[in-house]
């Protein structure tokens, strides 16, 4: 991001000047007036030719004189020792190129465009075979020294490094590449030359280079890249731009091509990073837990003298501005003022990365590290994403006081991001949306479509889901439909709002019936999944909490598990152990798919488009078939009604079932390699199948399916009305629609048909048989889940209250009755057993009607 006062063409023309004063702009005024006048003329576009590389155009005397000899007007300039014209960032481009294109500027990428590489200082190059005094002299040509000229502090020879990388680009073919993984790429041709062709077509000036490929091509080049990325990557930029613009001279890009290496084999976990990794290229993996707002970072400061109006520019070195002490034109001290709207800025974002749970040692808390993303990498990741980050590990000193320049001996570390990669081989659709479209080759898509035409594809996919868990086919089918999800519908433009597409499932039953294993399997399968436990979760841990940003010291919102699993699945184990305040936050998320926050002056509404997969155990440690679902797990009916499917996972007391289950469990311990490999292949097909359907198939209801859904809902209501009970609510109809859409996705169908509605009805009916059956009558009563009480229980409660009223009236005008005596009288009068709880409920019902009041052990009439 640059100021409005400077345009790309003006910047590029300034970079293209012939003399090596690019890093000495603050000393331009020391030269004679003729020199300044000539500099002003050059800014109008009349650029003198400069050599394009150390080995090109250096033999001609004009080029040598222009590059290595100072003009007469510059003899008075004091050239600092850390400046050398053979630095990889000082090579220019002949002025014959079109102004305004990337070729009109410096051939290597300017540091202003690569803030991720840090320092803008030019590396001093020294002669390895000369003494210290000779090293200070500017050499006439790198060719005269062969391979001996290196950047100070490294063993990087610019010409050799650039030549090796160009050979790598022009020659490398990946011998391990597979056609399925490289869609649209000829694996027999040089890989990166084909990618340059894609850059020419798409216009995206970024080349992602796999470090593993560089290592297989040249171990020395790979070592230099890992050890000295700040010096080597600009050389790579210069090499790839020369090849690209020689191959595509008419191509116009937004800026010069930037090389972004990834997959550095020096991959470490966060807790293993140590001082030896500082200023080296590393790759770490983790989960993004927070991203900051966009921060403008100054890359080049513009100063103006308040006395004589002389201006100068100063490059920013890792956030430090070298403010001029005096004006070089009028020699007035402390007269230079910073002009913000003439300075150059870049976009910057702070990202907090947390250690992945699978990389965490047992008994340890997760480590976090701060990342800084620049320019095009800003807003590329969101909280909840699992990423592999390649960047340069930095250490900066901590100031004793913000107003004092003294620093402590303790340093704080961060990573300047060069490349993100949102891939996870174990998870579904873990790539970004653009990469998803390129993930499936035509051959793979053809295979998936052939599978979708098989009549038993639904059963095949369900059996491939958690194959180690015995039976529970309907539960696996329900979870499979949850992974596919329905079609997201947005009718907000017509005033009807949004309708959720996510399916919520609750598993409840006896301990040891694989509920937690199913949750762990789903969590490891989806990319934006979160796994929490009931006792280990709080309300703010699920939603969001306010904290003070350590960088800006402002109050910011830190998101919780439900927001981090947006567009994913949130797995909640021990659902019944949650306290009431924690469960209450789920009401809005499970129906409206949003999360409203009003804390510490921060008022917002966050997206939480997540499916909830929960598991709950009964309060008596074993399921009591004589009690309803709500009585067994003690969950509020307002929450249970938001689950589309509620399954019971019971442990039947059956010897034949126990024998089959034991045989299945024992067989898991002596699987052959062929069985394991076959299971892995099934898993790969399952992941690809769901990922393709999730991203490309958006089914709509057909007329036939619409009529079938209407008939199903009306019939469900009719069955209950004949017995004076409610057997369906509009929420059940919406659940049927979502399940039918998910089943259509299983068939790769863009239209929901009657067969999908039938399967949705069957699955919904099976779940209701288990969870909404009245234990007294054995009849399905949906009001158990929606109101917390079956119609039979409600009728018995009313009858008992009426009988108690008649009993009290029959005793005459007695002002007070004993509680225990009244309880024994009503029990003796009734034909059915009456518990103390039922008696107290009847008393409360009469008290609500202002018929009586209970004080202690006495019942008084009103």
Swiss-Prot record:
Q: Where is this cross-link: Glycyl lysine isopeptide (Lys-Gly) (interchain with G-Cter in SUMO2)?
A: 438, 797
> Which residues does the annotation say bind ATP 2?
470, 515-516, 617
In this UniProt entry, the residues modified to N6-acetyllysine are: 219, 449, 857
User: Pfam families per the record?
Assistant: MCM, MCM4_WHD, MCM_lid, MCM_N, MCM_OB
Ranges for the region named Disordered are: 1-71, 90-121
Annotated residues for binding of ATP 1: 496, 642, 731, 734
Main location per UniProt? nucleus
Spell out which residues are annotated as carrying Phosphoserine. 6, 26, 31-32, 104, 119, 130, 141, 144
What ranges does the record list as Low complexity composition bias? Answer: 1-10
Q: Which residues form the MCM domain?
A: 457-666
> Where, per the database record, does this protein carry N-acetylserine?
2
Where along the chain is composition biased (Polar residues)? 61-71
Top-level lineage group: Eukaryota
Q: What is its EC number?
A: 3.6.4.12
GO biological processes: DNA replication; DNA replication initiation; premeiotic DNA replication
Q: Where is the motif Arginine finger annotated in this sequence?
A: 641-644
Q: Which InterPro entries match?
A: MCM, MCM_4, MCM_CS, MCM_dom, MCM_lid, MCM_N, MCM_OB, NA-bd_OB-fold
Give the first-level EC class, as a single word: hydrolase
Keyword terms, alphabetized: Acetylation, ATP-binding, Cell cycle, Chromosome, DNA replication, DNA-binding, Helicase, Hydrolase, Isopeptide bond, Nucleotide-binding, Nucleus, Phosphoprotein, Ubl conjugation
Residues found modified as Phosphothreonine:
7, 19, 101, 109
Please give the subunit comment from the record: Component of the MCM2-7 complex. The complex forms a toroidal hexameric ring with the proposed subunit order MCM2-MCM6-MCM4-MCM7-MCM3-MCM5. Component of the CMG helicase complex, a hexameric ring of related MCM2-7 subunits stabilized by CDC45 and the tetrameric GINS complex. Interacts with MCMBP.
What extra comment accompanies this record? Early fractionation of eukaryotic MCM proteins yielded a variety of dimeric, trimeric and tetrameric complexes with unclear biological significance. Specifically a MCM467 subcomplex is shown to have in vitro helicase activity which is inhibited by the MCM2 subunit. The MCM2-7 hexamer is the proposed physiological active complex.
Q: What does this protein do?
A: Acts as a component of the MCM2-7 complex (MCM complex) which is the replicative helicase essential for 'once per cell cycle' DNA replication initiation and elongation in eukaryotic cells. Core component of CDC45-MCM-GINS (CMG) helicase, the molecular machine that unwinds template DNA during replication, and around which the replisome is built.
State the name under which the record lists this protein: DNA replication licensing factor MCM4
Record the organism: Mus musculus (Mouse)
């Amino acid at each position: 991001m640059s100021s409005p006062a400077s345009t790309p063409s003006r910047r590029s023309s300034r970079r293209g000047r012939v003399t090596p004063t690019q890093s000495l702009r603050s000393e331009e005024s020391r030269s004679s007036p003729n020199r300044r006048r000539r500099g002003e003329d050059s800014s109008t576009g009349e650029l003198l030719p400069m050599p394009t590389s150390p080995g090109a155009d250096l033999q001609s005397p004009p080029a040598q004189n222009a590059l290595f000899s100072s003009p007469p007007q510059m003899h008075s300039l004091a050239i600092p020792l850390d400046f050398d014209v053979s630095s990889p960032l000082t090579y220019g481009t002949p002025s014959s190129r079109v102004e305004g294109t990337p070729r009109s500027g410096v051939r290597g990428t300017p540091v202003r465009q690569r803030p991720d590489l840090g320092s803008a200082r030019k590396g001093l190059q020294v002669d390895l075979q000369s003494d210290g005094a000779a090293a200070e002299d500017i050499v006439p040509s790198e060719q005269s020294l062969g391979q001996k000229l290196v950047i100070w502090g490294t063993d990087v020879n610019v010409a050799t490094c650039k030549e090796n990388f160009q050979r790598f680009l022009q020659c490398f073919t990946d011998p391990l590449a597979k056609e399925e993984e490289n869609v649209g790429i000829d694996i027999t041709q040089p890989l990166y030359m084909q990618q340059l062709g894609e850059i020419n077509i798409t216009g995206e000036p970024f080349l992602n280079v796999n470090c593993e490929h560089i290592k297989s091509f040249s171990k020395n080049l790979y070592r230099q890249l890992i050890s000295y990325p700040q010096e080597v990557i600009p050389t790579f930029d210069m090499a790839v731009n020369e090849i690209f613009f020689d191959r595509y001279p008419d191509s116009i890009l937004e800026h010069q091509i930037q090389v972004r290496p990834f997959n550095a084999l020096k991959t470490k976990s966060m807790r293993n990073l140590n001082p030896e990794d500082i200023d080296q290229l590393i790759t770490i993996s983790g989960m993004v837990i927070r991203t900051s707002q966009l921060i403008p970072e100054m890359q080049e400061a513009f100063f103006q003298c308040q006395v004589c109006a002389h201006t100068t520019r100063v490059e920013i070195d890792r956030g430090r501005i070298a403010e001029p002490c005096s004006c070089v034109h009028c020699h007035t001290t402390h007269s230079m003022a910073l002009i913000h709207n003439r300075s150059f800025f870049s976009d910057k974002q702070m990202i907090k990365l947390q250690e992945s749970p699978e990389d965490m040692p047992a008994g340890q808390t997760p480590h976090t590290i701060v990342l800084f993303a620049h320019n095009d990498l800003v807003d590329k990741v969101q909280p909840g994403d699992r990423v592999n980050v390649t960047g340069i590990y930095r250490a900066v000193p901590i100031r004793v006081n913000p107003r004092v320049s003294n620093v402590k001996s303790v340093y704080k570390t961060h990573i300047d991001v060069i490349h993100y990669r949102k891939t996870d081989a174990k998870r579904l659709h873990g790539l970004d949306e653009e990469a998803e479209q390129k993930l499936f080759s035509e051959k793979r898509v053809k295979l998936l479509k052939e599978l979708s035409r098989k009549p038993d594809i639904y059963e095949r996919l369900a059996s491939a889901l958690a194959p180690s868990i015995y039976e529970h086919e309907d539960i696996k089918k329900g979870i499979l439909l949850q992974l596919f999800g329905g079609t997201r519908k947005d009718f907000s433009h017509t005033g009807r709002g949004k309708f959720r597409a996510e399916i919520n499932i609750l598993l409840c039953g006896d301990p040891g019936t694989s509920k937690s294993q199913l949750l762990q399997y789903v969590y490891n399968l989806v990319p934006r999944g979160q796994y929490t436990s009931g006792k280990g979760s709080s309300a703010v841990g699920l939603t969001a909490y306010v904290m003070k940003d350590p960088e800006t010291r402002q109050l910011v919102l830190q998101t919780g598990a439900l927001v981090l699993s947006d567009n994913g699945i949130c797995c909640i184990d021990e659902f019944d152990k949650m306290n009431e305040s924690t469960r209450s936050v789920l009401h809005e998320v499970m129906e409206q798919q949003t999360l409203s926050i009003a804390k510490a002056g921060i008022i917002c509404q966050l997206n939480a488009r997540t499916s909830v997969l929960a598991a709950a155990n009964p309060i008596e440690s074993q399921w009591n078939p004589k009690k309803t679902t709500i009585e067994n797990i003690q969950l509020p009916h307002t929450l249970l009604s938001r689950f589309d499917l509620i399954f019971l996972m019971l442990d039947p007391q059956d010897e034949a079932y126990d024998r089959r289950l034991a045989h299945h469990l024992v067989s898991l311990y002596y699987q052959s390699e062929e069985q394991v490999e076959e299971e892995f292949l099934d898993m790969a097909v399952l992941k690809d199948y769901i990922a393709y359907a999730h991203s490309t198939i958006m089914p709509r209801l057909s007329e036939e399916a619409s009529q079938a859904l209407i008939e199903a809902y009306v019939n469900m209501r009719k069955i209950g009305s004949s017995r004076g009970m409610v057997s369906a609510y509009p929420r059940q109809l919406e659940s049927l629609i979502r399940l039918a859409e998910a089943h259509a996705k299983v068939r790769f169908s863009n239209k929901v048909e009657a067969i999908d509605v039938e399967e949705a009805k069957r699955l919904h009916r099976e779940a209701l048989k288990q969870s909404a059956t009245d234990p007294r009558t054995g009849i399905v009563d949906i009001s158990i889940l929606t109101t917390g009480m079956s119609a039979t229980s409600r009728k018995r409660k009313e009858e008992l209250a009426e009988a108690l009223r008649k009993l009290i009236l029959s005793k005459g005008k007695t002002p007070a009755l004993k509680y225990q005596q009244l309880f024994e009288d009503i029990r003796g009068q009734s034909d059915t057993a009456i518990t103390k709880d039922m008696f107290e409920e009847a008393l409360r019902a009469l008290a609500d009607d202002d018929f009586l009041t209970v004080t202690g052990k006495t019942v008084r009439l009103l």
